[in-house]
């Protein structure tokens, strides 16, 4: 057992060294109990690009809540940790660091550069694990994985080769998304589309015979040197007679044909479209239909190549300006039409993505997607929480395109394909025998290896691996809705293809962490929050409590320090009531407390308030467990908060003082037993959310660790509806008296007369038998409980279920003075309402002020109106008394 709880809750003291003690005790490893049902989670591997953010903290907190609860419930739990090499993101970070040193990856060469990246990985992997420790994550480090581990690399190679042999991986030349900064291909979902201010540049392409010009509009005039044709719709009467003729490409002064193709929309623009097959996906298809050449006019870094005359070597956007100026100079520019249009940007580097003709590796998605869709119609389907994300998943799968999986990077899984001087290609899990073979320099998309994470981490392709047999498929995946397609869908179709089973039974989807104003956290806004800073100020338990209670599954959560203050205050409340209970414990052990509580349940000992709290504890255990099973942690947290703060601390603990301050030692032992027993169950219910503070308090009265303590279950013997109903009526009576005092501004310290009238003989008997509690909480000078009590003429009255309560006001209150005070208060609220109403009726203020400022004024207005209405009601009550 630990030392006595300190007088003040200090999270830094509570959490210091605790995580290492858990690790030393091996409490996070699977139990190994073959009779226990396995429950496994694989952590969504964070990128080794830097420190974890609040989103990671949220994601991992939810997983830890699940795994800690299941561990306490007796499951054989495995939470497998690991990290992702994050190809393009990590390489970009390392290249940025090298640029600061004045060198590039090309200066170093591939091997030396990769050495630098591994050094980066080791540095940030250490940082991430330190942060996991600060968060209290109960992962099994003995099974830690990395996506470039040899075991995982073996799985990647096998999957690639198997899909290639089935014809589902192929190599081809297509238009892909190209990141000129990273110099690599991107998949469609790695491209973020943003509305930007741009322009349509209208220019004339003169017919070969000079008889007329055709006006063409484009947003990318710099690509005109790659034009190999212009297209018109074959049904467009304006141009169909021109099909087969030639036009002169401005500046280049070369002839290109006019083709008829339905890609040209007569209703859009001029109805004439420039065709640049090497730089536009639609033009690429037109080019294939008409057997047109493909002319690439751009280097891989976004500069113009040698085919563009004096513009060669220019950055694409500088070239755009120069080309437009040249068009204007030669009289080919018709007009520039400003407009906002959607432009693709690289998710990783932020630069504008360039459509580019390139030879890449692709995964053919047709059958893989069909398999994933079909699985959702079976009994073994993946359950999404909330269910609406099943539709999101199916929508992605039904509209999926072939997946470009090759990346022009050095950091990652190098594609297992080799070429020789004879133009032969070999694809295999190992290098081909003999000399003269060169491996493909490209690496695989990071998501290709991540898609295998649930089963490759368990030892696959070694299907006889103990972990694979025991813990796969995994039980639950926790992740954000922003990567359902990036990751979740790919894990599902790869797992179905290679293991014949879904990768997980459940997918819990959470939202995004936003700032107090509802904005997404980003570097550009400067509103990001470092979870380690929050932990330093409030402690990990407070952050975890906030994150678990912030929202429902699938919903975003808004971070605020006000909410963090509330979280800390709640833990401080738990600390204080625990300290009170343990200081008044009298050396009681948990075993003795358990025996005494059994006597309370059977009616051998204790009083009605003891039976009431045990009944409510039972209900709390049932509701919390039910909501945990549905991943409704916010609902479970609300139930716990209400039980702990309201029912246990504010009522039961206060009610027990009647016994603890008495001279009856037998009653004291029973009360102490119920207090300790209930506290113990509360701590066990809370442990998965607040691991540090619950362990600290648990250690004051119990041996071992709460990590492996049994989770509370419902005890049918505690069900006592009569006790529950009776004490709730008692609470209603006490609340009614307190509220009446407040309404007429009578201090709690001033003794008053309380009359309780009830025609319910059982209730009358109950109140009379528990009159000591009523007196303790209401401070009566005179208390009468009876079935026949005439209503006093000048009195406040309240009605509760089964009874009416009167507070005579004679000699207690000067009604005239109270009316005057209330009238003055009413005038104050009216003045505040007038001021805020004037501001909100000002159209200029509403239009120009920040939305959060306007909302703040609206909140003020609602608050003042509520206070005004309450004051009016009190005035009406006072006026009735005067009559």
Curated annotation (Swiss-Prot):
PROSITE patterns attached to this UniProt entry: AA_TRNA_LIGASE_I
Domain of life of the organism encoding this protein: Bacteria
Reactions performed catalytically: tRNA(Val) + L-valine + ATP = L-valyl-tRNA(Val) + AMP + diphosphate
Keyword Repeat: no
Protein purpose: Catalyzes the attachment of valine to tRNA(Val). As ValRS can inadvertently accommodate and process structurally similar amino acids such as threonine, to avoid such errors, it has a 'posttransfer' editing activity that hydrolyzes mischarged Thr-tRNA(Val) in a tRNA-dependent manner.
Family (UniProt): Belongs to the class-I aminoacyl-tRNA synthetase family. ValS type 1 subfamily.
Name of the protein: Valine--tRNA ligase
Native organism: Streptococcus pneumoniae (strain ATCC BAA-255 / R6)
């Amino acid at each position: 057992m630990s030392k006595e709880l300190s007088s003040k809750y200090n999270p830094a003291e509570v959490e210091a060294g605790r995580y290492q003690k858990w690790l030393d005790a091996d409490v996070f490893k699977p139990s190994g109990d073959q009779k226990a049902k396995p429950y496994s989670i694989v952590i969504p591997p964070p990128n080794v690009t830097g420190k974890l953010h609040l989103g990671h903290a949220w994601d991992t907190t939810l997983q830890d809540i699940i795994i800690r609860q299941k561990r306490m419930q007796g499951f054989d739990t495995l939470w497998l940790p690991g990290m992702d090499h994050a190809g393009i993101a990590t390489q970009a970070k390392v290249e940025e660091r090298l640029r600061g040193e004045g060198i590039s990856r090309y200066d170093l060469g591939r091997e030396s550069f990769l050495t630098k990246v591994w050094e980066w990985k080791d540095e940030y992997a250490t940082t991430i694990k330190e942060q996991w420790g600060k968060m209290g994550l109960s992962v099994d480090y003995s099974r830690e994985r990395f996506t470039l581990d040899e075991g995982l690399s073996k799985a990647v190679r096998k999957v690639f080769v198997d899909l290639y042999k089935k014809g589902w991986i192929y190599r081809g030349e297509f238009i892909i998304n190209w990141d000129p900064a990273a110099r690599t291909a991107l998949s469609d979902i790695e491209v973020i589309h943003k509305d930007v201010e741009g322009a349509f540049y209208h220019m004339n392409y003169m017919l070969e015979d000079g008889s007329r010009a055709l006006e063409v509009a484009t947003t990318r005039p710099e690509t005109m040197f790659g034009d190999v044709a212009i297209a018109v719709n074959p049904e467009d009467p304006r141009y169909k007679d021109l099909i087969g003729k030639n036009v002169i490409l401005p500046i280049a002064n070369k002839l290109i044909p006019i083709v008829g193709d339905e890609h040209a929309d007569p209703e859009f623009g001029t109805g004439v479209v420039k065709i640049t097959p090497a730089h536009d996906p639609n033009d690429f298809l037109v080019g294939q239909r008409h057997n047109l050449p493909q002319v690439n006019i751009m280097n891989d870094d976004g500069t113009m190549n040698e085919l563009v005359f004096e513009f060669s070597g220019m950055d694409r956007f500088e070239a755009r300006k120069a080309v437009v100026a040249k068009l204007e100079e030669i009289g080919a520019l018709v007009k520039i039409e400003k407009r906002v249009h959607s432009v693709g940007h690289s998710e990783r580097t932020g630069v504008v993505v360039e459509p580019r003709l390139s030879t890449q590796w692709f995964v053919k998605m047709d059958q893989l997607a069909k398999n994933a869709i079909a699985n959702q119609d079976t009994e073994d389907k993946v359950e999404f929480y909330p269910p609406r994300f099943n539709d999101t998943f199916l929508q992605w799968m039904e509209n999926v395109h072939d997946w470009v999986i090759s990346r022009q990077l050095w950091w990652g899984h190098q594609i297992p394909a080799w070429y020789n001087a004879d133009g032969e290609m070999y694809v295999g899990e190992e290098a081909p025998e003999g000399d003269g073979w060169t491996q493909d320099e490209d690496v695989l998309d990071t998501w290709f290896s991540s898609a295998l994470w649930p089963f490759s981490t368990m030892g696959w392709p070694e299907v006889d691996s103990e972990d694979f047999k025991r813990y796969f498929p995994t039980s639950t995946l926790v992740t954000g809705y922003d990567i359902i397609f990036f990751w979740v869908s790919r894990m599902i179709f790869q797992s179905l293809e290679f293991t014949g089973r879904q990768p997980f039974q459940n997918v819990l989807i959470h939202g995004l962490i936003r700032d107090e104003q509802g904005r997404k956290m980003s570097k550009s806004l400067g509103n990001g929050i470092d979870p380690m800073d929050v932990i330093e100020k409030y402690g990990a338990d407070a952050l975890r409590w906030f994150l678990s209670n912030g929202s429902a599954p699938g919903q975003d959560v808004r971070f605020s320090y006000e909410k963090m203050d509330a979280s800390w205050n709640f833990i401080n409340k738990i600390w204080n009531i625990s300290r009170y209970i343990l200081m008044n414990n009298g050396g009681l052990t948990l075993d003795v407390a358990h025996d005494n509580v059994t006597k309370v349940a059977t009616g051998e000992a204790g009083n009605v308030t003891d039976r009431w709290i045990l009944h409510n504890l039972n209900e709390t255990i049932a509701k919390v467990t039910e909501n945990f099973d549905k991943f409704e942690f916010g609902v479970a947290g609300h139930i716990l908060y209400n039980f702990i703060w309201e029912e246990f601390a504010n009522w039961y603990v206060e009610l027990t003082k009647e016994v603890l301050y008495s001279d009856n030692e037998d009653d004291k032992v029973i009360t102490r037993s119920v207090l300790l027993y209930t506290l113990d169950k509360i701590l066990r219910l809370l442990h998965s959310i607040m691991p540090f503070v619950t362990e600290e308090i648990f250690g004051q009265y119990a041996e071992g660790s709460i990590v492996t303590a049994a989770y509370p279950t419902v005890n049918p013997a505690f069900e006592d509806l009569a006790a529950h109903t009776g004490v709730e009526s008692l609470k209603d009576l006490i609340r009614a008296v307190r509220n009446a005092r407040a309404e007429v501004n009578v201090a709690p310290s001033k003794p008053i007369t309380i009359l309780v009238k009830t025609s319910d003989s059982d209730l009358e008997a109950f109140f009379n038998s528990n009159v000591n509690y009523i007196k303790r909480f209401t401070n009566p000078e005179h208390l009468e409980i009876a079935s026949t009590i005439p209503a006093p003429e000048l009195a406040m009255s309240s009605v509760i279920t089964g009874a009416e309560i009167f507070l005579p006001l004679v000699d207690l209150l000067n009604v005239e003075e109270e009316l005057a005070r209330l009238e003055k208060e009413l005038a104050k609220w009216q003045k505040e309402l007038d001021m805020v109403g004037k501001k909100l009726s000002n159209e200029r203020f509403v239009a120009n002020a920040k939305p959060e400022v306007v909302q703040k004024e609206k909140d003020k207005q609602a608050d003042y109106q509520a206070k005004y209405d309450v004051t009016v009601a009190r005035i009406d009550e006072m006026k009735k008394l005067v009559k």
